[in-house]
């Protein structure tokens, strides 16, 4: 069931989303060669808690950390570790959810670490651009499928794989609510968008095949061909005037 949010609820989600965005901005600055993903996780948790929030992912179905930290061929749900030290040329996807007063804000970025190969940088750029292509389709009267259609069309035009196994979602008091928001499909699929819907749009795009598998930790999803992946996400509310991005950072685009 899709829950339309009241103006008060949207304000609550806005507060959580700003905290998520601010935390991600801090992590982008801290993610350099030599730092471990566990150190980044500690920074994120301390920042969220010191600003009155709760790290939503920690303990969610047993997930042990504040951030999902996925490196290179890892698509989503990588577990931070003291043994995972970032290296020059890596790409690091950080997916982060924080909550304030029972409402969540969800966002993700993929960060180039040091000097990254041009073909991988292009993957990051196109993936981030595809997120905004999807957000452009957030209009009253459009169907949810218009979002995925825009993402898929743009990314496949560049020869990239569009992950099918993980999708975007609604958000509110629960971290994952209806509707599901695939990054593929046709314009006429899915429910109609209505004012008050809060959507997490999150393209997960690969340099090779779209197929993924989950590692033995039961969390980390990787590309089956070992090629790099990118992941960007925003929390967006549907309004009569179009989309409003609630998790926008001060620097709107990470990849220039």
Predicted feature residues:
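Active-site neighborhoods and metal-handling regions in enzymes and metal-associated proteins
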Residues: 1-256
